[in-house]
Amino acid sequence: MDRSSASRPDLYLIADNDSVYEQDLLRNPGTIKPWLAYIEYKQQNGTLYEQAFVGRPLDALIISILNDFQVMERACKQLPRSYKLWKMYLEFRTKHLKNRNAIKYRAEFQKVNTLFERALILLNKMPRIWEMYLTFMLQQPLVTQTRRTFDRALRALPVTQHNRIWKLYKTFARSASGQTAVKIWARYMQIHPENAEEYINLLVEMGHYTDAIKRYMEILDNPRFQSREGKSNFQLWTEMVDLLVSKAKKIETGPQTGIDVDAILRSGIDRFADQRGKLWAGLATYWITKGNFEKARDVFEEGITTVMTVRDFTLIFDSYVEFEESIIGSLMEAAAVRADNGKADEEADFDLDLRMLRFEQLMDRRPFLVNDVLLRQNPNNVIEWEKRVALWGDNNVEIVNTYTAAIAAINPKKAVGKFSELWVNYAKFYERGGDLDTARIIFEKAVKVPFKSVNELAETWCEWAEMELRSENFDKAVEIMAKATQAPKKSTVDYFDETLSPQQRIHKSWKLWSFYVDLVESVSSIEETKKVYERIFELRIATPQTVVNYANLLEEHKYFEESFKVYERGLDLFTYPVAFELWNLYLTKAVDRKIGIERLRDLFEQALDGCPPKFARPLYLMYGNLEEERGLARHAMRIYERATRAVSDEDRFEMFEFYITKSASNFGLPSTRPIYERAIAALPDHEAKEMCLKFAEMERRLGEIDRARAIYGHASQFCDPRTNAPFWQKWEAFEVQHGNEDTFKEMLRIKRSVQAQYNTDVNFIASQAIARSQQRAPEGEEATAAAEREMDTETTDAMAALERQARAPIGFVAASTGPEGGNRAPPAGQGPVAAPANPDAIDLDDDMEAD
């Protein structure tokens, strides 16, 4: 390098104050520090020209004059390997050209380019210098030079630093566009194949659709490819298909390019089952775009006959219809033009008529095609096969073909719906046509089919017999049912054993036997009917209705004793509650038949033996009524008395009322006293209270006032005055009518005593509070809270009273003041009892004061 120029600077740029720095440079020519100090000094204290050079934007003329005389230039020439000096110098030079027009200041830009080239002679491994240079080049319209500079940078720098260059290179490719961008990206993809999506977008923007499809195929065939944009393989594949369909004419296909659109879309149809409708329509659209209408029609036909869902079918069919309508519309417009011009084209008119006919046929086929789709989904769908038969209307040939195809396709164990109905309808089809022999052949085959359930097989046998009945072949119908019910003498087959075929279990089908017995009963003799019923009992498949029907049949034919035996056999088969209904019928029939009283008594005793309490009441009433009519009244009373102990708790009160009524009617009112007494002892409190009122009223009617008063006194223990006011009102009315002052006072004393008793019963207080809260519930939550507070207060008062009673002196007995003993005084230390007029305030004030 020529160092003489660095030692001979322009003297007018050197001021007197610069001599110190110049001498320092002479003493240390190879050191960077003096140069940095000199540059910093010049930037702050240079001459007018220098300040203009180093600190302000200059026009091109001044820069051209001062370029060879600046301190930075001298420094870079003196120390050409200094990265720091070159970076400072290059930043300084590029700064003054920032936002300048590269065309207008072309010469100045070229000087800076040359300066970068000088710097890169020795600093070509510095990526920052290359970045500055390339960024500066991007401001200039020099495409070829810029591209070559990028290539030089990539060759000069190690691979680990290429990312810094490629970041700028991709920006340049976008701006350069065209073939340049494509080739740059092709090179970039060799290093970074993971950015294939960005490359594909560029190819699509540039119109290189064939290359874009190839790239799509590459990344889809690469199992290791991970989308930078988070797209799945399906999304990428869908984008490729959309591009193939939309740009069909601009994409090169065939063996030369390796792009087979038909194979690509068909592979997607096999792979993506939920997108088949869209893909079939896309493939057809591709051929339409290519102008191959016949191929498109073939694709549509294949699509609508292979898809598995109605949604996909609808999508393809609608596209197919739209395609045909567009072609017909074009042909009709052409025909209209020919008609206006007076021209005739028989071939074109024939083509239009043919397409119209094809379109009508397509629309007529739609219901059948939809049915085909549903049957492809599940060929075992009996309901859809029936719909297909209905679609054919009066086309007998196709109906037979459909039935035949359905029977061949359906697996009886997997059938959806009743497979037996299909067989039955098939036979009825021939029956309606008058071909009974063929219908019988179909039924013979049907009863051998291993249906899912015995019930289906039973329905098939019954339908066969009904067909014979419709043809008035009664003997044939009976013969068919006899054949259906054939079984070993002592069958051990379990009807619910699914491991056995329906044919092995059919002889225990109640539906089959029910039809059989009705058939025999209507067309055969009573003896034959009895044999069928007996066989039902032998197989132990009789139902309660069977027992009743058999018994009624025998009764109608005057076989009364046999009818009773049938009831008894039924009772051996069934337990309660079914047995209760059978006993009810049996006993009613026996009573109506007027058989011996002793036998009837035995039957009733047998019925009541082991009878649950909830079913006992009707039987006891029937038994008692029998004794009243044909036996002794005392026997009836004993039966009613037994009933009061045997019936359920819910029925006991009513049973006692009935017993009392019967006793009064037969033996007079006094005979009911022991019954009332036992009822009061046996019934719960709330029912005992009602019974006491009835008992007291009965005694009053007999004039036994003292007995009635005693009963009221006994019942008072069940009645809190605050919750059972009607009871006390009745007693008060009784005393007003039949009592005196002493008895009335005694009633009031008992009332206070009972209330005090309930005040100290914590359990009763709690239940009472709950009852009140339930009564006040409609008033809202505030009323409920008030009831709870009242319950707490009463409970506290009751507990305080118990404590005071425990602290009372032992052995203290109050004097008697009343006519019958009077009221007891409160224990020592306790306040006086409140007046009866305000019973709720008993001991409340004293308790509050004690607290």
Curated annotation (Swiss-Prot):
Coiled coil: none annotated. Residues 842-851 have a biased composition (Acidic residues). Keywords: mRNA processing, mRNA splicing, Nucleus, Repeat, Spliceosome. Residues 771-793, 810-851 are annotated as: Disordered. It is found in: Nucleus. Its main location: nucleus. Residues 825-841 have a biased composition (Low complexity). HAT repeats lie at residues 12-44, 63-95, 107-139, 141-175, 291-326, 398-432, 434-470, 487-519, 558-592, 595-629, 667-701, 703-737. SMART domains: HAT (SM00386). GO terms for biological process: generation of catalytic spliceosome for first transesterification step; mRNA splicing, via spliceosome. GO terms for cellular component: post-mRNA release spliceosomal complex; Prp19 complex; U2-type catalytic step 2 spliceosome. InterPro entries: HAT (IPR003107), HAT_Syf1-like_N (IPR055433), HAT_Syf1_central (IPR056350), HAT_Syf1_CNRKL1_C (IPR055430), Syf1-like (IPR045075), TPR-like_helical_dom_sf (IPR011990). PANTHER family: PRE-MRNA SPLICING FACTOR, PRE-MRNA-SPLICING FACTOR SYF1. Belongs to the crooked-neck family. Involved in pre-mRNA splicing and cell cycle progression. Associated with the spliceosome. This is Pre-mRNA-splicing factor syf1. It comes from Emericella nidulans (strain FGSC A4 / ATCC 38163 / CBS 112.46 / NRRL 194 / M139) (Aspergillus nidulans). The lineage of its organism: Eukaryota, Fungi, Dikarya, Ascomycota, Pezizomycotina.
